[in-house]
Amino acid sequence: MINRKGFYRRLLYALALLIVFSLPVSDPLAKGARVEADKPAAASRLPAEGRYKISAGHSRFIVRAFASGLLSALAHDHTISIRDFTGEARFTYVTIEPASLQLIIKSDSLAVTDKVSDSDRKKIEDTMRGEVLEADKYPEIIFKSTTVTASRIDEGKYQAKISGDLTLHGTTRNVTFDASVTFYEASLRTQGQFTLKQSDYGIKPVSVAGGTIKVKNELKFSFDIVANR
């Protein structure tokens, strides 16, 4: 004879297990758990306006100088690092605009990063700081924005067009360049590139061996800059 009490007890136990294992399991990723420390910040988590100080130690700002002339194949292109610069960026979140950017570079902080001998490095840097930039006479290179426009491309990410006055070697000219801007909770990162002609700023490109080896007039700048609130 079947023990009804035992049978019903086992049946209830089986039903309880079935209910437990049928419940949905909580998935932290499904709830939007943060899986990246540097995930772009949502606009709702940022203040209305932001003021950021540029961090040169966490940034990269370089110049490429290219060789030209009949014997350019015997020369080398040079990569120059801008090491000492300060600045401030101001943005209005969601729309970006109005916004502003100011950057001050120490002229004597430009350094050659190519693999060359110490003596060659010194010669190149002495020429660059002395004959080209005249760093003693013009110790700072200054950029001040006049207009900044931007369009949103994703959460916390924008494509910006920045125009402003660049003062280099005692000459001020207007320049315009594109930059990507990504906002994080306590910082921003901007990346881009632009070109300049040395002659526009009263600089005569370096030339040796009767002009058979010389530096091209056009220089290419690229930047990856981090700024913190």
Regions found by a protein language model. Give the residues of each.
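Bacterial N-terminal signal peptides that target proteins for export
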Residues: I2-A14
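Bacterial N-terminal signal peptides
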Residues: L11-P24
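Low-complexity, acidic/polar, glycine-enriched regions of mature
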Residues: S26-R229
